Amino acid sequence: MEVEKDWIRPRENTVEALVYGMINSDGVELDLRLTEDDMLVLHHDSKTEFGEYPECLTINDLPEYVETMDKLLENKDFIRRWTEEGAFTCIEFKTPHPSSGKAGGWFNGREKEQHMIKMIQKLDELLQPIERSSSSTVIYSFDPKIISASKKINTNLEFSRLRPNIRSWGNWTTQRIIATPSFLANSLPKLIDRQREEGSPMLPCSLQYLKGIESKINIGWTVGLEGKKLDRLTKYRRGYPIYVWPAKSDSERLLLDAGLTGLTDDLSPNSVTLDSGHARWIKPATQPLTDEMRKELDETPMGEHASKISELQEEIPSWYELSDSERRNFVEKWKKKWLWEREIGTLLSETAESSLPWEVSRIIGHRGTGKSHRGGS
C-alpha cells in the first residue's frame, strides 16, 4: 500500500464520500433530512452553510453540495457492496430545528412523529426495489419519536434509538450539556435493556459509555473495553450489537477486540497504524482475518504496516468469496469468543455471501469518510 499524499477526504454526506466509505470499510453511516418538497437529502446540520433550514427549502433551492438519497441509490458500486458483499448502512434521521417551524416547532410532539412517519414512508418507497439482507440496514434517530412512528407503519425496515438523547438545536457544547443528566442516569447495561425492550436490533451509543471518566460516573453497572469491565460487558450484552462513535485511533482496536462496531471519522488510505501501535484493518467483517493472519499482521514491524496491509488485502478473500463452510467457521468462532446468545441456526440463517449476522463487529465510515466540521454525531 503506497502512501497517497494527494488523498483529500471527500465532503461528508456526499455520494463520493459514501461510496468511498462503502468500498473501503464494512459500511457507512449517513444522515437524512426531508425537504419542503418531500425529498430525502444527505445532510447532517440543522442549517446549510448559508444559514438556511433544509426542511424549509425545495430540492432546487438547496445548495449544490446537498445531494439526494435517490442519487446515492443510483450508484452501482454502493448498491453492489450493500446488496452483494455484506456491507452495512446506518441511516440517521435528522429532525428539523425547532425554530424552522417544521415538525411542530418547539412543542408539538405529534407533528414531529408525523414528520418521522413521512420520512419512513419516503425511505421505504426508495428501498422497495432494492433486494437487501434483513441484517444489512438500520434506521435510527436521537428523537425518541422514531420508535413510535415506526410502529404505525407497515414496513420491514429495522429501527433503533441513538442514546443519550441529543437535541436538534444548539451547538455541540450545548447539546452535550443538555444531554448530561440523561447520560449520568443511564449506564450502558441499562441502555441495552431498554433497546431490547423496544425491539431494536442494536444500540448506537457514545464512546463515553465505555472509555474515560464519564464511563465511571453514571448510575448502574460500569462496563468498559478492558479487564473485568470488558468481561462484564461481554457477559451482559451476550452478543447484542453495539455501534460506538467515535472510534478514534486509540480506541478502534479495543472496540474490535471487544466484538463491538466502531464508527470512524478517519478512512484515509494513509492511516495504516493505530495509536495503539497495531496495524489497521478496516474490513474486519467484509474481509475477515483468521487468527493466524491477525497474529501475522500484529507482529509486523510498524515501518512495514503499509506494505503488509496491501499484501493481505490482495491475498485474503472477501466475505462474499468465502465458501459456506468458511463463513460458518467464522460465525461459530465469533459466537464462542463473544458469547453470542442466539442459536447457531438463527445466526446462519442471516449468513450468506451477501450478508452477515447482526452481531458481527465492523468498522463503519461515519458520514462516509468522516465528519467535515466540528459538529456533533
Predicted segment positions?
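Phosphate-group recognition and catalysis centered on beta-loop-alpha active-site segments
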Residues: M1-S377
